[in-house]
Amino acid sequence: MGMRHKVFLDQRQKDVYSCRKCGTHLATHDQMKSTNFTGRHGVAYLFLSVVNVYEGDPKERNMLTGRHVVRDLSCMGCMAYVGWTYVKAYARSERYKEGLVILEVSILDRPRK
C-alpha cells in the first residue's frame, strides 16, 4: 500500500468541515445528509462522504437505532477519533445508512458564515 496524501477541499466554493484538533479537511456542507444524529460524544452529523480519514476494522455495535456493523474513523492528520462509517444495518428501516458516515460535532470546526 502506498502513502496516502491529504485532500484539500476548496473553501472558496464550498463550506468545509475540518478536524478541530489539527485543521485537516474532512467534508463539505453539500455532502451533509442530516444534522439529526447522536454520536458517542453528543450531536453528530450524517454525511454522504468524507475525506482524509483512516477506517478501522469492522465491528458490530449496538446503537440507539439497533445493531449495526461500523468502522471507526480517525483523522489522517492527527489520528483523533472523528466518527464512524456504517457498513451494515440489520434492521431494514436503517439500511439507508449503509455506506454513509457519522462525524462527531464535538471534533468539527464548522464553516464560518
Label for each model-derived stretch:
Residues 1-113:
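N-terminal pre-domain and mature-chain start segments
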